[in-house]
């Protein structure tokens, strides 16, 4: 029951919402987390939790960082209404919810955004470290898609903050790889 890993400089502990599904043979549900996680976080005296990406993704091992469904709450833990209930339960306990959001790249799987309309609409190139597509931020359609997506999560699910993952890969074309 101890937090996984060491806390960062702000006292945050890393880890997915459900770090041990294989031990139980199933994932916790949003409803389970509404009780167990909320009570635990409140009892520990924390004011906020940061959840890893909640968008749909095909590979469990990615913890949500290889997103395919930017507008779909992952069904691993339940349905969208149950996610809303979980976030409401956090708020009722005085706990804010910060959600990881992944604008730095997206899953290269065929059923994702890659060549969505038969052309390279969203993608720019493959990220060499992650094997994911980079968004083409020069395109207005891409910027509109991403801004609309952030607003979707803030307005519909009432998350209190967004942590943008992989910002350096959006800012620097060398993907954070040091030149010799």
Give a label for each model feature.
Residues 2-180:
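Substrate-binding/active-site clefts of carbohydrate-active enzymes
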């Amino acid at each position: 029951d101890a937090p996984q890993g060491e806390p960062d400089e702000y006292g945050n502990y890393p880890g997915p919402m459900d770090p041990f599904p294989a031990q139980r043979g199933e994932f916790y549900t949003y409803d389970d987390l509404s009780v167990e996680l909320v009570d635990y976080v409140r009892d520990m005296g924390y004011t906020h939790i940061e959840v890893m990406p909640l968008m749909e993704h095909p590979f469990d091992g990615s913890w949500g960082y290889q997103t395919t469904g930017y507008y779909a709450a992952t069904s691993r833990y339940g349905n969208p209404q149950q996610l809303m209930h979980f976030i409401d339960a956090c708020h009722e306990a005085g706990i804010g919810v910060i959600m990881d959001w992944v604008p730095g790249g997206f899953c290269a799987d065929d059923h994702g955004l890659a060549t969505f309309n038969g052309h390279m609409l969203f993608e720019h190139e493959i990220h060499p470290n992650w094997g994911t597509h980079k968004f083409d931020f020069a395109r207005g359609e891409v910027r509109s898609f991403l801004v609309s997506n952030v607003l979707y999560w803030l307005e519909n699910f009432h998350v209190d903050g967004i942590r943008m993952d992989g910002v350096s890969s959006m800012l620097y074309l060398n993907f954070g790889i040091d030149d010799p």
